Amino acid sequence: DVLDTWFSSGLWPFATLGWPNKNKYLNKFYPTSVLVTGFDIIFFWVARMIMFGMEFMNKEPFKDIYVHALVRDEKGQKMSKSKGNIIDPLELIEKYSADALRFTLLSMASPGRDVKLSEDRVKGYRNFLNKLWNANNFLKVNKCDFNKTSKTPKILININKWIYGELIETKNIVEKNIKDYRFDEAARNVYQFVWHSYCDWYVELSKTILYSKDQKAIKEVREVSSYIFKQILILLHPFIPFVTEEIWLKNKLDNSKKIFLMLTNWPKGKSKRDKNFKEVKKMINMI
């Protein structure tokens, strides 16, 4: 009999852990939680791992299977040297950054669809990174002290209530989409919040207070704007880890002795909705 090269690879989930001998690694790591793979090897590899797992271990090797998209050119064609349509990821990283390429691929990773990659899309997400960097500079220029905002600040001003409510709403939907493996939706959710709600609306509306003489209002806006921005960095970190970590370290955001952003807890909090919140949101939607 002749077996193809994929046959023995079906044993991989447990053969790599010392099987057929029983040991602590096999007990700890089998079964695992999720397998990430492409649709082109579902039959050749994934199906056989499940069949062998059930046969020899009496358990399926993983709970979830995440089938990721394949990357094609902007017209949906398979990349090949003969067609001359290959996009070198290293060149894109050198030109636009690893985070820009990473965010592009995540935002386009819709279930059941291949990624039609173009340089213009990567360039667009590079602009998003610039937007985030400029927002950080705006806060620093306006004397927003990040290290005084580890706890949710007291919120009285309407625009602050609005942006805090938007933050919690975004956090909840991003969290749900990540758990559901909808990374494209999660990326778009946080993108919309940062670019439109925070940068386009909140920052611009807050300028009228920051440039006023109302010291009490100025203090609240400084605290809320920096608090929200810190939560933004945490929300964005799974998508764009390099620039968010860089901003975090530059601002020395080391609350609770957690020097690195990657060690920080996921944002928590409940939305403080009231009549004024709804009125501000309605006004913004109308404009």
Question: PLM features: residue spans?
Answer:
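Structured secondary-structure scaffolds
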Residues: D1-C144, I163-S206, L210-Y211, E223-L236
